[in-house]
Curated annotation (Swiss-Prot):
Pathway: Protein modification; lipoprotein biosynthesis (signal peptide cleavage). The chain crosses the membrane at residues 6-26, 70-90, 98-118, 139-159. Keywords: Aspartyl protease, Cell inner membrane, Cell membrane, Hydrolase, Membrane, Protease, Transmembrane, Transmembrane helix. The gene is lspA. Belongs to the peptidase A8 family. It is found in: Cell inner membrane. InterPro entries: Peptidase_A8. It is an enzyme of class 3 (hydrolase). This is Lipoprotein signal peptidase. Its EC number is 3.4.23.36. The keyword Secreted does not apply. It comes from Teredinibacter turnerae (strain ATCC 39867 / T7901).
Length: 168
């Protein structure tokens, strides 16, 4: 088992902070420049549409009556604490895993900030094809998805680290 190495993890916490900042800046701009539920076309398949998501990813639980705010906030906070420790325990060779976890951490904290401050998460990016529309999302959601994809990629193709930290 690896010891906590908070100093080595600082760069990954910096990545998470960058995600939070980009997420909050873009949400702030969207909230001030867009009208709620009114699409602003960018391309034939992409637009910005301000939405307030009271639920989870892809608007799950959006009409659950209010309990979901606290449940999802507690879940995000718990996962974030776990990720902070996980990142600090990773050996230096596991940089892709650390990057992936930092992206997930930044995304989780970006959405947690919204949920605690506003009671909902600001979404504004919409991809669509004809009448079919993907649920609205934001930079935090994108970071979480990219981080999850990197975790899968790393688990399948990444550098394996032996018990004592030697790369195989």
């Amino acid at each position: 088992m690896h010891k906590l190495n908070v100093l080595a993890a600082l760069k990954w916490y910096g990545v998470a902070l960058l995600v939070i900042l980009l997420d909050q800046i873009t949400k702030n701009v969207a909230s001030h420049m867009l009208v709620l539920h009114q699409p602003e076309p960018i391309t034939s398949f992409f637009n910005f549409t301000l939405r307030h998501n009271f639920g989870a990813a892809f608007s799950m639980f959006h009409d659950a009556g209010g309990w979901q705010r606290w449940f999802l906030a507690l879940l995000a906070a718990g996962v974030s604490v776990l990720l902070i420790f996980w990142i600090a325990k990773l050996p230096k060779q596991k940089w892709m895993e650390a990057l992936a976890l930092a992206l997930v951490l930044g995304g989780a904290l970006g959405n947690l900030y919204d949920r605690m401050l506003l009671g909902y998460v600001v979404d504004f990016i919409v991809v669509h094809y004809k009448e079919h529309e993907w649920p609205a999302f934001n930079i935090a959601d994108s970071a979480i998805c990219i981080g999850a994809a990197l975790l899968v990629w790393d688990s399948l193709f990444g550098t394996k680290v032996a018990k004592y930290g030697d790369a195989k």
